[in-house]
């Protein structure tokens, strides 16, 4: 028996789930090796099996949660040298800098982790990105030492500004509380920050406004990284860079490139330039393969303008620390000395090296333009669904809607998150798949996803798993819309306590009850043309949370420009009062009934949770 508290067990369960990628309740050798590799730890298959064997009490070749807890108990009782190797691996995945006190510990005293290297990198990035922001001039630049960064995040203003830097116009800054900041107004900013982060695809399931106000370091670090990463990755796609077509391998199509996560695209881009420079070296990761600085030296020389003064003298230096210094000197000549210190290169700090390379691509892609390549741009609806899915923490992160869902696994994950207990994991085919039969396994997953939808009374007439596998856009969007609606309705139903599912008509009736009580004109439904002005939404927000809408900001001319301003105001104000809104201002102006439904439903949730 272990003597951990309930809170500690909950924390360990979260760690366990980080390893247990397929959710089968066991950590396999493959899963352990995969996550250690992601964290920059080079381990062989034999080493991984030995780690597991050391703690696998029932001898089945994997680690269940009970065994996991026993390992952590041993680690607590022994010194680091005497702890099982697996326990050390868990700590490495967690991070390297444990912090105590209110900023990083739970009430039970469980310590959380973050690395000073990350903190310094994020601070430098923020200081540069937001240097000209007049609202932040009193707190920038943020010093790198101590907890000053977390204190700077206290009132929500800094992270809201960072979100707008990553994805411009996410937040209507007219709604930010910038002056006379009491506890209530600070909390409003933090609620706006969290709901806006969700809207751009951040997974903030376990973060509340109070965590940010209290300066809980590990949570602020995690959110900051997600925001920065989304901003760095936002333009690394075929829509913004059709010249990425040049990264295709022989026999591949554009579809093959769309399947790749951004990390893989960046590795291809890196290797493309290594090959163009005549180097035989190739990188397969952002950790071990870049430690000696050789590949960085070649890459920087290859992508640099000829007059930038970038050179390759680092290759003549045997000392790796000095080589890394040279790399960053060259990066500085390109205006790209971001995220890394020399030791981050030498130690192969995966996360920061990934950010460094992404920033290099964004500033100096150095790819020749291509002609006659048809690029289908992501629609607003597709992006909204993608951000919603990612905000729920689906794994892997969805970069392309149809490539990300065609094997059925993400859809099944969504059903599992929206309707806990619905999914029978024994019916799910998890990768890796054998070459023979892989297609059938994926189609079986898609068929199971469709069956789950039917079990939830979704309208799926004429849709089967093969449609999803074939990336039929119309049918895939139909399923995703019903999942999004199901998510909103399931929360509403739970809050109502009636056990009776909330219908669309109920949401219209509630909306009109709010408008009527406020003496405002009612709507005929979610297609009502008056919604295009944004005013009915602002009226409902004001009815739910009196005083939240500044009447001086509401435009009444009915012009397209004023309507859009009102829509932006409505979306950000709704998020500020606690609504999780994925609808965009354009959805309001164009009166997209599906998105309008979710917005009013989210406002009803706010009223129920008062």
Swiss-Prot record:
Residues that, per the record, bind Ca(2+) 1: 20, 22, 24, 26, 31
Gene3D superfamilies, sorted: Calponin-like domain (1.10.418.10), EF-hand (1.10.238.10)
Region entry Actin-binding 2, spans: 366-608
Domain spans labelled Calponin-homology (CH): 116-232, 260-365, 379-488, 501-608
One cellular-component annotation, GO: actin filament
Alphabetical list of Pfam families matching this protein: CH (PF00307), EF-hand_7 (PF13499)
PROSITE patterns per the UniProt record, alphabetical: ACTININ_1 (PS00019), ACTININ_2 (PS00020), CH (PS50021), EF_HAND_1 (PS00018), EF_HAND_2 (PS50222)
Domain EF-hand, residue spans: 7-42, 43-78
Keyword Ligase: no
A biological process from GO: sexual reproduction
Gene Ontology terms, MF aspect: actin filament binding; calcium ion binding
Annotated transmembrane regions: none
Role: Binds to actin.
Protein's UniProt name: Fimbrin
Organism: Dictyostelium discoideum
Protein encoded by which gene: fimA
